[in-house]
Amino acid sequence: MNNPYLQTPPVVKNLLIINALVFMATSLLPVGNRILLYGALYWVQNPLFHAYQFVSYLFLHANFEHIFFNMFALWMFGRVLEWELGSRRFLIYYFVCGIGAGLLQLATVSLTGEYYVQLVGASGAVMGLLLAFGVLHPNERILLLIPPIPIKAKWFVIIYGAVELLLGWTGMGGNIAHFAHVGGMLWGLGLLYWWRHKHKIRF
């Protein structure tokens, strides 16, 4: 019998395809720079800001490394979560985490005054998936890439989240939107507990 967790379910598959197509468009087509310009998420008072960017920015990536690691994590954790949550609930969860990530990043902009922010990438949504995996499978072991050691999912989520918060708070993370990563995790955690309260899921 085939193990469904080894297969790629429809929402994850379509998200992978759309992200790949958009990345090729921004990298290869003459209008690629304009897609990035108008699709990225900006501070709300920036003349380039539009509400649709809370969704469009999730499908844009800065470079190959950026999209590779995001899509690898989407494939790795998304397969399991879509089978468990169902395609509809998984899709809702993904976009809530992604949009929530953008909201928290813009909220920090209002405090730091860095109004030139241009946010791209599915990292916030993917961090929400990582959080969900850690909540639903706390004792499942994840094999790290560097160093190649196994660690329980719950500890990996806690450590990763703490590092992201520290880097965001200290400003040591360069151009990486660490508070967007934290935002994706927080919105994901809130949604999971809301669903549990409504008896939609159990953990």
Predicted features along the sequence, with ranges:
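A detector for small-residue-rich transmembrane helices and their helix-helix packing motifs
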Residues: 1-203
